[in-house]
Amino acid sequence: MTDKDIPDEWDTISEDQIKNNLLTLEISNKLKELKLLEEEYEKLEEKEKEIENKELNKTDNKIKEFIKNEIKKGGEEINKEQEQDGEEEEPLLLINFTKWSYNKIKYIGGGKIENQDLFDRLLNKLNSEEQFFITMTDDLLERELAFHTTNKQWRDDIKQLEQAYKGDYFSLLSYPPMLGGFLLESIWSKIKERTEWKSVNILKCIYLAKTNRSLLYKHNMALAIEFMALEQKLLGPTAKRLKDEEDLEYKIKLRQYEEIMQKRYENEINEGIIKNLQQVIYTNEGISNNLNRINNNKINEINDDYNNNNNENYSGSDNDDGSYCSTCDGSGSDYDNDENNDDENNDENNNNNNNNNNNNNNNNDEDRMIEEIEGDDTTSTSFQQSDDDEADNELDEEDNRKNKKEKLIEERKIKEIEAERIHKENEKRKIEAPPPPVLNILDKIIAMIFSKLTVAQSNKESHYQMLNRLESSIKETWIEEFGCLPPNCLWREEQ
């Protein structure tokens, strides 16, 4: 500490104070040295940053110059290709003739195909008739046997399809100059025509144009999308109000469904509690609780109604009182009386036979009289037997009619019970099923377009992930441009 400057006034201070003052002085000097070192370190950092920034600027400038040069080269190449081609983009179709012909048309190498005659006939048929071309290509596109391409993209597309459908023969097919009364150029130009809205251009000009659907479908869809966007733009805040009303309607349906389900659960719980209480009461009182009796009341009522309907539907003859007797025929005669008469006749015959045996000495006149009487009896019994047969036939017919009526009534009852059961099950399903969520029309349009895009077999997962991100981007852009998603009531497409 001898090398430090000591003030003159310290001569009169005690030794302890001198030591404390020296320590504080030493600390202050050290702090000054640290500040100087920090300042020097900050200056060094600033110099290093300046050097790094200069180097980064140099590299950035080099990268920018490289990108500009590449863009210029790409633009020059595109211009050269356009100058060399000298033609506009044109829609084409790639058709899988192998699958279409059920593996009859195949490529056999050397620029030759199997069943060349069949291939030529199909091509001539497609090129000769416009309506056949429209219907057949629509069917092939739906069955994924035809794919959209253009005159500038078909080489890459056919390579991709040949990798996905190995061994199949694809051929390029051009559209006729007229489709559905429209020029091909006007249809394609309308699909590719750009609008003032970015979301519409992405959806219509890019992905709708290259989806695997017919040109007439794309044309109608493009017009519908443009009309919907224009109408929403003109409506302004009204479109937002319509969208809010649709959302509110769905919320009301969902709330009603929740209330119905809550009431149903409460009723089920209450019924269970009541049944348990009844069971406890019956067991405490020593009464056997026949729960099936309660459930069988309805069945007994149905059976009673069924029997009453049978009695009402059968009424015998016109002269009776409407009741049916098992011992009566349709004319109201009593079969018990007939049986009694038969018994009396049999008794008389037996008495006559006994009298004949006891009176062996009667004369021949009496014998002849007895024979005549017996002859009369046989004729009367024959007539009576024929009457009985007719009555039996009538009874059989009446029984058949009654059986038919009973079967019809039974079938009708079964059908009514089954229809009631099905109706209750359907109502129960309607109650159990929640209201389906309202899918916005823009989601439907995107799904219709994206579902028919060509997907490479090697990168399906990345393709669908890309479509998911793209859908979110289109919807966000639509909301930025129009204020909200389009209300479903604005859709005007006519299929």
Swiss-Prot record:
Lineage top rank: taxon: Eukaryota
UniProt region (Disordered), positions on chain: 305-404
Extent of Acidic residues compositional bias: 335-347, 386-398
Ranges of Low complexity composition bias in the record: 305-317, 348-363
Protein name from the UniProt record: Putative uncharacterized protein DDB_G0285495
Organism: Dictyostelium discoideum
Lineage: Eukaryota, Amoebozoa, Evosea, Eumycetozoa, Dictyostelia
